[in-house]
Amino acid sequence: MIFLIFSFLLFFTAIVEKKIIFKISFFIILFFFCMTYGFGYDWINYRYAYYHSLDPGFIPFFAEPGYFYLMKVGLFSGLSFGVFSSIVTLFIYSSIYFFCIKLENRCLALFSLFSFLSIYILNEWIRQGLAVAFILFSLIQLNKGNKGGFITLVLIAGLFHISALVSLSYYYMHGTSYGKIKNKKGFIFLTIFVFIVLFSLYNPTLVNFIPIIGEKLFDYGSILEGAGVGFWEYVLTSKVVFAYFFMLCFIYLLYRQDKVDGSALLPMYMLFLSRLTQALIRIGYYFVPALVLSMDGRFIKERTGLKTSLNKLVYMTSVLMISCIPAWNDAIWYGSQTHLTIFSNSNEINIEISRKCKVINKYNEHHTIDTCRW
């Protein structure tokens, strides 16, 4: 899969850590993904919504207005869905570029962001990809001390995916020592929050009355109930949970070693908690930029090349392991083997949709791709 190939290549660029290598590798990835789309499945739903976005009375399958109005502008301008997707991808990767160039370890930052986000956020869950793009721009403003700009950009991100509002917690994290008492309250709050979500998922009828959020929890809970998999069975048998737990333990050991810098603990803890249930996976991804920022500070004085420290190599190997997670999911793995380009014609697109439907229907009976259920 192309995503794993790029992750492995970026792994080695992070060892070398040269500005020119960062630019070359970034623009190669940018060019490839701006020319292609259709790696997963969600694009099928989005493509249908795109070509019906100007129809009177048409209601999209998502509630947030940001992406829908972008669709309207794109279709009104006469853009094909492929070209529209290319422009959206360009914006998302531009946010990654401007975020990374503000850091000391640019190659490491690009490698980390791509490994955590590539297949899901940057290609499959495109609305959340746009939300993350605005979050990256908001962090640039926050680091400049422009708190108003930070809040404004987070609110704009919420127009594309409501879950982005969780990024307002960055305001709380910024400039604090994560090992102090104040941050211990953050750990307690996150633990209680996740416990409430888990309780709601396994008792969905209790929260169904809550607008939007309750309905989503009810839907996720119904899927869990239909699958017949209990919480502990899922946690103890999940390779994904193990991978995130391993990385959390490693970062905790780094914190114990440094005695001071524990800034990566909270975002990594949230990433781990988010993997305990499907309902929180999307929320967890918003903490990846905070983790990347923290690890950039941790390795700011580290040597590169053949003198790269063991700690940095272990961290990078852990991130590389995270990038392999899509390979553990048959639906994602086989669904991302083929793709389209912005030059694909209608016949090629229809063939690809048919191919995707065969895969998703085989591996996921609870999928939400409407075209594949007709």
Model-based region annotation:
Residues 1-9, 27-28, 87-91, 126-134, ...:
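Membrane-embedded alpha-helical segments of multi-pass membrane proteins
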Residues 21-23, 97-116:
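Transmembrane-helix signature of polytopic, membrane-embedded enzymes
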Residues 39, 44-48, 53-55, 64, ...:
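Alpha-helical transmembrane segments and terminal signal-anchor/GPI-anchor hydrophobic tails
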Residues 65, 77-94:
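Loop-to-helix entry region of an early transmembrane alpha helix in multi-pass inner-membrane enzymes
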Residues 108-125, 129-135, 163:
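Membrane-embedded helix bundles of polyisoprenyl
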Residues 118-119, 149-173, 267-275:
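Membrane-interface alpha helices of multi-pass inner-membrane proteins
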Residues 135-149:
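Membrane-interface transmembrane helices that cradle and orient dolichyl/undecaprenyl
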Residues 189-191, 304-324:
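Signature aromatic-anchored transmembrane alpha helix within multi-pass, membrane-resident enzymes
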